[in-house]
Amino acid sequence: MAVLLETTLGDVVIDLYTEERPRACLNFLKLCKIKYYNYCLIHNVQRDFIIQTGDPTGTGRGGESIFGQLYGDQASFFEAEKVPRIKHKKKGTVSMVNNGSDQHGSQFLITTGENLDYLDGVHTVFGEVTEGMDIIKKINETFVDKDFVPYQDIRINHTVILDDPFDDPPDLLIPDRSPEPTREQLDSGRIGADEEIDDFKGRSAEEVEEIKAEKEAKTQAILLEMVGDLPDADIKPPENVLFVCKLNPVTTDEDLEIIFSRFGPIRSCEVIRDWKTGESLCYAFIEFEKEEDCEKAFFKMDNVLIDDRRIHVDFSQSVAKVKWKGKGGKYTKSDFKEYEKEQDKPPNLVLKDKVKPKQDTKYDLILDEQAEDSKSSHSHTSKKHKKKTHHCSEEKEDEDYMPIKNTNQDIYREMGFGHYEEEESCWEKQKSEKRDRTQNRSRSRSRERDGHYSNSHKSKYQTDLYERERSKKRDRSRSPKKSKDKEKSKYR
């Protein structure tokens, strides 16, 4: 009570449960005997679930029982046997396929999973695979499409009955030998069962590596299309754009455009910068109007010295500037021009970090000096009797401040601020104002000194006059004789 199935991948032996499922086993044995299963496709392979075959049409909707062969279309199907109940517990269980009305025809399935309880009571178990489980495993691992149809044909080439306990029904036509397959049977529209799937046969190692690289690139492109990074997996980068790397951080867009413009008109030249700091990332993209100009620049400019750096030039592999509408959409030349116009428009909003700071915010040192000047002038008015050393200290303070100012000038020059000349004139103006204030202070002090000297000299002169008058009065009050004696003594 066993049958040998010769498949395109190997032989499989099935033992039948003739006592538990006599009608199903009779149907299966007699169909094998009339070579009904020869060249049938395995048309449904669901990994770790089932392998389905037995339909001569290969669609899964055909096939009839042996009783239909004997008694006509009215007997194409027979009732399912449900008693005793046999479960789909192990791999290799063989069952007749239910056509939806608890009836069976010619199709059967082989399980490739364990404990498939949801098949119990639906499909009738009538045998199991005892030999050839390795072949069942190969079939289980074959590649299939979305409908679970194998890409390469797997067929039952021949069936051999090893033991048949049932008598042949009358009028059963048994062929003398296996019939030849028809063209319709072999033409499935897929890879033939006898075809070798070897793309690398007869190719050199270099060609094999190239084919593998192309397949890997194609796979990655499809993956990028799936995640939305590419409009189409078959899209190609533009052939008029150059990629330039190993640039000096000080190299600007204008510098590169001037250097590369000698090869032809340039549409755009962009040095890629960090979005947050604005610093150059040392690579750029240059788009030419003509592909010929791009090729000339590629051959001439590689390894050229620019700003003390040896640059590297290659054709761009980026499609970042390509605009598409929706996933997998195509783009036109007009769409590309519209995209360029949108990129050239100035943004309506400016990031706070990119706004130029006001002029006052860059001169904290000058503002501090002005505050010190106002403070010193206020103290000068309140204390006019300060010594001359105060003026000298102010001059020394100015001399000490000059290096700071020069340092700031160097810093602003390095930062590249264009309005440095205005800031320098502002500095000179403030310096002249301070010099005027210092001169005014010195003049006021000199006037105070002159006034003090004149007042002291005047008071001394008045004191001398007063003493003279007083001495005259004393002389008058004395006797004439004494005065005469005194005068005589003078002339002695």
From Swiss-Prot:
Write down the SUPFAM superfamilies for this protein, in alphabetical order: Cyclophilin-like, RNA-binding domain, RBD
Q: In which tissues is it expressed?
A: Abundantly expressed in kidney but has a ubiquitously low expression pattern in other adult tissues.
- Where in the sequence is Phosphoserine found? S178, S393, S471
Q: Supply the EC number(s).
A: 5.2.1.8
Residue list for modification Phosphothreonine: T182
The signal sequence is: none
Instruction: State where it is primarily located.
Output: nucleus
Q: Which residues form the PPIase cyclophilin-type domain?
A: 1-161
A GO term, aspect molecular function: RNA binding
Instruction: List residues of cross-link (Glycyl lysine isopeptide (Lys-Gly) (interchain with G-Cter in SUMO2)).
Output: K201, K212, K218, K321, K362, K405, K460
Q: Name one Pfam family in it.
A: RRM_1
Compartment list: Nucleus
State the InterPro entries in the record. CRIP, Cyclophilin-like_dom_sf, Cyclophilin-type_PPIase_dom, Cyclophilin_PPIL4, Nucleotide-bd_a/b_plait_sf, RBD_domain_sf, RRM_dom
**Protein task:** PPIases accelerate the folding of proteins. It catalyzes the cis-trans isomerization of proline imidic peptide bonds in oligopeptides.
Q: What is this protein called?
A: Peptidyl-prolyl cis-trans isomerase-like 4
Q: Which organism is it from?
A: Homo sapiens
